[in-house]
Design a protein with these regions (language model features):
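Residues at alpha-helix boundaries and the short loops/turns that link adjacent helices
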Residues: 18, 22, 38-42, 84, ...
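Extended intrinsically disordered, low-complexity coil regions enriched in Ser, Thr, Gly, Ala
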Residues: 37-70, 105-135
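A domain-level signal for the structural core that forms small-molecule/cofactor-binding pockets
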Residues: 17, 29, 87-90, 94-95, ...
Length: 135
């Protein structure tokens, strides 16, 4: 089921404690563009189908990445793309956006998403891995 634009941004805004909808939208656009570069095939399409159309298009037409970024490098890349951001604020942005995307995706799809990402992304999505299970 697709989440509506306003509901998605309202959740990101609340979780990120942003003062304006524009701040929440900026974070969502950057984080999902970077995430899209790490997902392929049906998993990316399935996640996009659960997002508002504007954000789905960003996920489906991502920034290019030569190789998958570790979670730490993902945070640094996010900070570089958001004007005035630090790694600390970027981590906050990532958590607000990816936890909202994870809620929209549901557990089964999130498991597939995390299988395509380097280890450690589970915490960025707010879904710590179960010990003994990948990722």
């Amino acid at each position: 089921m697709t989440i509506h634009w306003e509901a998605f941004l309202d959740t990101v805004r609340e979780r990120g404690e942003y003062s304006t909808p524009e701040e929440a939208e900026r974070a969502a656009r950057v984080v999902l563009a970077l995430l899209g570069a790490h997902l392929i095939g049906q998993v990316r399409a399935d996640l996009a189908a659960r997002l508002p159309e504007h954000l789905a298009l960003i996920l489906l037409n991502p920034l290019q990445a030569a190789a998958p970024l570790s979670p730490e490098r993902f945070v640094r890349a996010t900070a570089a793309w958001i004007e005035g951001a630090t790694e600390t604020t970027a981590l906050w942005d990532i958590g607000a956006v990816l936890s909202t995307a994870a809620d929209a995706a549901g557990d089964d799809l999130m498991e597939q998403v995390l299988l395509q990402l380097p280890p450690g992304y589970d915490t960025l999505f707010g879904h710590p891995a179960v010990p003994g299970r990948h990722p």
